[in-house]
């Protein structure tokens, strides 16, 4: 899904009336239906694949206003894309047991990039509700693609009580064309680590079966602001897995703290 909102103020101390405020919005997302299959090819090795069909609408908005100059009209540019296409994911997983209490799993997933079927438009809005708005809406033939994606993950389980894991994701957005622009995005990377602790799987008390979870991640976004990569993102998550009595269900509760940091 696409969802962001950013603001920037450019101050001109010599000519205050030319100072400008810029706002950037992203909205929309994609829906996905998929069919998957997996096979165990060796004792500890499994492979699988998903093929999916996805569709949806995505809009990117850039708005510029001049707070100190009422005679200069604000300009809003909306770029919209309606997408219908497919996606292929191929993965493999290897699990190794060491003794009675140790288990390690390594997984990898790959998705090739390709061009997407789309209908695109660009809309320019000059003015606002007070001044009146002039709208110029035009369809455009635009190239748009999905990135090559590679993910690698590792997990370790001790005595069925402690699980720790790490994931790394790389998406080659720099090779994706957007609205016929070949250098519209940056490569995206994300690193995530986490742990889950179960006090006593064989315990009789309720608290012995509560799962305690903690995780953190660092992510570099793929989109640019004024030709530069947008702010990096950090996040920390903590939560619990609460077993529901007399069922196999678990109620998961979590909280997340997110911080962005960068020049934009």
PLM regions and their residue ranges:
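Outer-membrane beta-barrel porins/channels
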Residues: 1-264
